[in-house]
UniProtKB/Swiss-Prot annotation:
EC number assigned by the record: 3.4.21.92
Subcellular compartments: Plastid, Chloroplast stroma
Family matches, as Gene3D superfamilies: 2-enoyl-CoA Hydratase, Chain A, domain 1
Subunit composition and interactions: Component of the chloroplastic Clp protease core complex.
Organism: Eucalyptus globulus subsp. globulus (Tasmanian blue gum)
Uppermost EC category: hydrolase
Similarity remark: Belongs to the peptidase S14 family.
Pfam families assigned: CLP_protease
Catalytic activity: Hydrolysis of proteins to small peptides in the presence of ATP and magnesium. alpha-casein is the usual test substrate. In the absence of ATP, only oligopeptides shorter than five residues are hydrolyzed (such as succinyl-Leu-Tyr-|-NHMec, and Leu-Tyr-Leu-|-Tyr-Trp, in which cleavage of the -Tyr-|-Leu- and -Tyr-|-Trp bonds also occurs)
Protein name per Swiss-Prot or TrEMBL: ATP-dependent Clp protease proteolytic subunit
Amino acid sequence: MPIGVPKVPFRSPGEEDASWVDVYNRLYRERLLFLGQEVDSEISNQLIGLMVYLSIENDNKDLYLFINSPGGWVIPGVAIYDTMQFVQPDVHTICMGLAASMGSFVLVGGEITKRLAFPHARVMIHQPASSFYEAQTGEFILEAEELLKLRETITRVYVQRTGKPLWVVSEDMERDVFMSATEAQAHGIVDLVAIE
């Protein structure tokens, strides 16, 4: 039994014969992108590169970003969000499974009116966490200041993209807030819930 990423036939425009490419490359060529893991620098750079390349290739054709992510690192997540705002094509975001933490931040960054959740998807928002638990006092204070700046940035993006008041978003980010697809729609994180 083969293990790994499946290969599918793909014929490039103007070519007679199809070549075998892995399924993700085939889907990328159709402008379908996937965030199906924890957000880190590697996946962030891959998605940023794909979005920039595909927008250069055709800046009128929308991109579709499917999200099933438990969250991850803040800076790589913000980089994905910023790129989505920068590229010319609209970026549709589709939550399937779970969009938690930075996954939900990327989800809310989709083009407004083009953010979707599957009916059984879950969304979770909370405040960013620190990684310096054993740091020296000076480093810890600097880390805390930076964390407060990041929290403010993330909160303001949620306020802007959801239409919710600052006090509501700030209160929700105090703890882990899990939502169903319809609750995420009511919260303004997604615009549509797919029909079963």
